[in-house]
C-alpha cells in the first residue's frame, strides 16, 4: 500500500540531500520518479531541487494553480514514487492532491520541508501534511549555537533577530539560522569563530 510521508526538519538538516538520495536509489533500480518543488523557491532558479553541497536536479515547479493529481494521473508511465521538496510552501489543495495520488493512484509520495516558520507558526503546507500524512518523520540537525537539537528557524536581518514580518522570504544561511528553543528566544548572533558551544 502506498503512503504519504512527511519528513520535516529545520534549515540545513539535509532534506534536499535525502530527496536526491531517494531519487538516485529508485532510478538505480530502473524505477522512475517524479521530483517536484515549490515555484516559490527561486534560490537556484525555478524548477530545481538544489542542495547546499552543490547537488542539483530539475524538478516540476509547483505553482498556485498546478493540478498535481492531474499531472501525475496523466503521465504516460506511472512513477514508482513522487518526491516533493520545499513542501511547506504548498497550499492546502496541493496537499490534498498528494493524498489523492497515494489513495487513488497507489503511488507513494514523500514530501520534505520545514515545519514551522521564523515566527514559530506552521506553514500552510506543513499544517496539512501533518494532518494528512500516514507517516511523519523528523530529520534532525543541531543548533547553530550549542549541542542541542535544532527545532526552530531564526530569521536575521542586519545581524539582528527578526520575529515579525512576511512569512515567506526566500533566503539561505545569511537569512535563516537553525536553532534550539533556548537560542530562538535568546540568540547569540556572532561570527562562527566566536560561537560558544558550552551553552
Curated annotation (Swiss-Prot):
Organism, scientific name: Streptococcus pneumoniae (strain ATCC BAA-255 / R6)
Positions with a binding annotation for ATP: 9-16, 85-88
Catalytic activity: thymidine + ATP = dTMP + ADP + H(+)
Enzyme class: transferase
Quaternary structure annotation from Swiss-Prot or TrEMBL: Homotetramer.
InterPro entries reported in the protein's UniProt record: P-loop_NTPase, Thymidine_kinase, Thymidine_kinase_CS
Gene of this entry: tdk
Protein name: Thymidine kinase
Gene3D superfamilies: 3.30.60.20, P-loop containing nucleotide triphosphate hydrolases
GO molecular function: ATP binding; thymidine kinase activity; zinc ion binding
Recorded GO CC terms: cytosol
Family that this chain belongs to: Belongs to the thymidine kinase family.
Compartment annotation: Cytoplasm
Residue positions binding Zn(2+): 143, 146, 180, 183
PROSITE patterns: TK_CELLULAR_TYPE (PS00603)
Pfam families: TK
Main location: cytoplasm
Domain of life, source organism: Bacteria
Disulfide bonds: none
SUPFAM superfamilies reported in the protein's UniProt record: Glucocorticoid receptor-like (DNA-binding domain), P-loop containing nucleoside triphosphate hydrolases
EC number assigned by the record: 2.7.1.21
Amino acid at each position: 500500500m502506498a503512503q504519504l510521508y512527511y519528513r520535516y526538519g529545520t534549515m540545513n538538516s539535509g532534506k534536499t540531500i535525502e530527496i536526491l538520495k531517494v531519487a538516485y536509489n529508485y532510478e538505480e533500480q530502473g524505477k522512475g520518479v517524479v521530483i517536484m518543488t515549490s515555484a516559490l523557491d527561486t534560490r537556484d532558479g525555478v524548477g530545481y531541487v538544489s542542495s547546499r553541497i552543490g547537488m542539483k536536479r530539475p524538478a516540476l515547479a509547483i505553482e498556485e494553480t498546478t493540478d498535481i493529481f492531474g499531472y501525475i494521473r496523466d503521465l504516460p508511465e506511472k512513477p514508482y514514487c513522487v518526491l516533493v521538496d520545499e513542501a511547506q510552501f504548498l497550499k492546502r489543495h496541493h496537499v490534498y492532491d498528494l493524498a489523492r495520488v497515494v489513495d487513488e493512484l497507489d503511488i507513494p509520495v514523500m514530501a520534505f520541508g520545514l515545519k514551522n516558520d521564523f515566527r514559530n507558526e506552521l506553514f500552510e503546507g506543513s499544517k496539512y501534511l501533518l494532518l494528512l500524512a500516514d507517516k511523519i518523520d523528523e530529520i534532525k540537525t543541531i543548533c547553530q549555537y550549542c549541542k542541542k537539537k535544532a527545532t526552530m528557524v531564526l530569521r536575521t536581518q542586519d545581524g539582528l533577530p527578526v520575529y515579525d514580518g512576511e512569512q515567506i522570504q526566500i533566503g539561505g544561511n545569511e537569512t535563516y539560522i537553525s536553532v534550539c528553543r533556548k537560542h530562538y528566544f535568546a540568540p547569540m548572533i556572532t561570527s562562527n569563530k566566536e560561537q560558544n558551544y558550552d551553552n
